[in-house]
């Protein structure tokens, strides 16, 4: 037996390597594969990328993943290669039980954009389970008078495999009394019956031991055995008789435990203990024994466990009635499970795209989900809808799969996220529903430019301000988030292109605060305007502009300026008034202006002082000076007035002007500027005399020093001339640099000669000392050597006399520069 199992395992491993892959596309959206069970973890199934017609690199780029309809995924996808592998060993019996075919459903989900493909893997059964008898040693009591051909049903063997690998046949060990007959159930495994071939004789053989073997159809086949112990009973003439050979019943799947299913009845014509009948479910599969029970006395069959129409629709129950003498009879109860709408629909979300950009176009896939209703036969059609009015709609994709897509434009600034409730409802009765909530966040895109709070700004700054003084702030808001809402401020020149505004103002790029760069002067500029640009930090930045006007406020920083009468800084202006002038005579008018503006430039005129305050008056508003009365002979000829001109600033600034008014008899006499006679009558101050004497003495000493220095200088010059001789030739034409001193003689020489000169600084005189000629004397072939003398005569060249005269001419040039 161990060798057989080892060989079977080897064959199974070989079969795992030679997997038959059946690939098809259902409705162009479903891919199907077939694999054998018991494949080891990591076994290759198929290449999904190839079957879907996708490039291998796109699986990883689009975040491909597998989503199972159940709670567990049995496969894994290699994103780089597109290969599909078994995640763990597959056991068809634990996955699907007796269901055939065994199909595992999952989806291949891709994102960016969201897309899904339905896939199915059919798990083929291998013969990895042997038939098993639950009761290894069943006991049968058969009366010796049992007629030939009597049948005795045996407990069926259980084989978890399906199809050919499941239970196929029974065999019985060789004996002289019984042979075996295999029977079929409409729903359930095959079972065997013992058929009596030879009459029993308790006196000859009170017991018979048999071995029954259950065999499946695998290759190689597997089997299981049970040992039957037959006890031959003494004669019991009558066996129990059921009222029906087959009982039929219908039970709703939602019936509670203990519900009555059916009542079987059997009678026995014997008397005494042989007439007492006991009912049992001895020869039934384990699933029936867990679900039903029978009262041994009255034959009532009741529910022991829950029913599930979606799992098992009908039950075939074998009922055994045994009398007191050991004789038994069998009957069947066929139970049909009635489906009720007891399962609400299930909503299974396989993928959600969140966050979702707010600029996503309509029909963008947001989520993928499937709906399953186990009561689809009675529940009717399942509908799916959204509980609220949201910018999303549900679209069917294939089968029971759906996608949630956008229905209209999204705006994160209005709604930053959605809690979407998916409702699935069947038609009942009664109608059942299920809800699943999907949270979808809306991500921001830069679709809102900065917006200034004001259409335009007017700011004020007072003149004479300190540099870098804060004068105001502009503020813009951006409805976006993150970097898309980070605003940077900058200055733009006004529309007229005047860039000088940048010399007056600066802006903090982070907060929009404006500062004055320099001190403002209202008299130079009264206002100016510029443009502030606000730019957000988005990848494709957006901006907006606003005009800012800065008004300079005037300060009273300018005193009134007198335009008339003109002031020469020493003497006041004189005006002539005839002595014949009457009261109200216009003498003159003081004209003044103020560089400020507004109230600071309003001027008023006041008579501050006067020789005779009762003789003249000043108009407060216009500065006109009039006589208050007629001039008399007693009035002094010189009238001195001091006029105060004052502005209206806070504090007020003022300027005074002095006027001399001469009272004359008429304007026909020539008039010289009148000097104040009191000056001649003033006495000379003794200190002034001493000052004048000191100045005279100092001047004399200075002149004497100059004469002495000049004599010494002439003497040194004569000594210096005796040490050098003059070269015979001079340059005809010479060009020298600008730092050389050129001297032109006053008639003694016809052309200048350059020399280096040195000035003795700090000596208090203007002495120049000629050290040497700047350039050597080279003879020129065309030099004439002719020098004009003071008397205008000329001598032949190269004569001694000419040489001496040239020397004198050279000294004359030096004297000219001295």
From Swiss-Prot:
Extracellular face residues: 29-691
Biased composition (Basic and acidic residues): 800-818
Record GO terms (molecular function): calcium ion binding
Subcellular location: Cell membrane
Transmembrane stretches, start-end: 692-712
Domain Cadherin stretches: 35-133, 138-242, 243-347, 348-452, 457-562, 577-672
GO CC entries: plasma membrane
UniProt-listed InterPro entries: Cadherin-like_dom (IPR002126), Cadherin-like_sf (IPR015919), Cadherin_C (IPR032455), Cadherin_CS (IPR020894), Cadherin_N (IPR013164), Protocadherin/Cadherin-CA (IPR050174)
Membrane topology listed for this record: Single-pass type I membrane protein
Swiss-Prot/TrEMBL GO biological process terms: cell adhesion; homophilic cell adhesion via plasma membrane adhesion molecules; nervous system development
Cytoplasmic side of membrane: 713-818
PANTHER family: CADHERIN-87A, PROTOCADHERIN BETA-1
Biological role: Potential calcium-dependent cell-adhesion protein. May be involved in the establishment and maintenance of specific neuronal connections in the brain.
Protein name: Protocadherin beta-1
Lineage: Eukaryota, Metazoa, Chordata, Craniata, Vertebrata
Record gene name: PCDHB1
